[in-house]
Each structure stands twice: as structure tokens, then as C-alpha cells.
């Protein structure tokens, strides 16, 4: 199936894939060739792309997915390939954002730090899956 992932500033990914695992607002969903038409909201999390026997992990920051006629279009706020994420840095940024949330004295500050925390949590999860995958099948939602 053809997969096209679009960020606000560019097309991030446009390739064929055999399987997708999408982080939806109600949990992970698997997409294979000839999937029934579907429009779904996407949550922050790890998007898995299988091409042959190789999995690629992407840190997805919300958006929408449209599945129709052998094509998957994903429009997202942001996305990053797990192979480009520094795990230790992402873990530190997540910890800092979480601490800042608890110390925030305004609703706006709390929400800004919550968004940072959610972003870094998705990046940490993607980086861990990339690091631990070493040829095996992914385990999503942990």
C-alpha cells in the first residue's frame, strides 16, 4: 500500500509499506493492504511502518489518518524517525517537562509543559522501540 505522511512544512514519507501500526485516540490499530476505508484521529505515540521484514519506528505527534483504496494518508503536527532520536536527551527533556508541569503556577504554563511532556514521551517510546527491535517484531502500547 502507498503511505504518505505529511508534516506542516513538507512531505515526510512517501513510500510503499506492507503494514502500519497507528496510535489512534482509542489505542493502536493495524493497517494492511486492502484495509476497509477509515478516517481516524491519531494520538501522540509510535507509528510503526513495516517494509518487508524491516520495521521503521516514528515518533508521531497527533494528527489524522485516512485509509482508502490501497492508500494511507497521514497528516500530522510533527513526526521524527526514531533512528534520529537521542534517547538520553529525550528522557531528560521528558523529566524536565514533567517537573515543570508540577511547578507551574498558571494553566497556560501547565498546558505548555504537558505538551512538551507528551512530545518527549512519544520520542522516548519510539527511540526505545528502535533500540530494542534488533530484528524482532515490535510490541506496541507499553
Swiss-Prot record:
UniProt similarity note: Belongs to the ATPase epsilon chain family.
Subcellular location: Plastid, Chloroplast thylakoid membrane
Record keywords, A-Z: ATP synthesis, CF(1), Chloroplast, Hydrogen ion transport, Ion transport, Membrane, Plastid, Thylakoid, Transport
Keyword Protease (UniProt): no
Pfam families per record: ATP-synt_DE_N
GO MF annotations in UniProt: ATP binding; proton-transporting ATP synthase activity, rotational mechanism
Reported function: Produces ATP from ADP in the presence of a proton gradient across the membrane.
CDD domains: F1-ATPase_delta
UniProt main location, coarse: plastid
The protein's assembly and partners: F-type ATPases have 2 components, CF(1) - the catalytic core - and CF(0) - the membrane proton channel. CF(1) has five subunits: alpha(3), beta(3), gamma(1), delta(1), epsilon(1). CF(0) has three main subunits: a, b and c.
Native source species: Ostreococcus tauri
Protein name as annotated: ATP synthase epsilon chain, chloroplastic
UniProt cross-references to NCBIfam families, sorted A to Z: ATP_synt_epsi
Mode of membrane association: Peripheral membrane protein
Covalent S-S links between cysteines: none
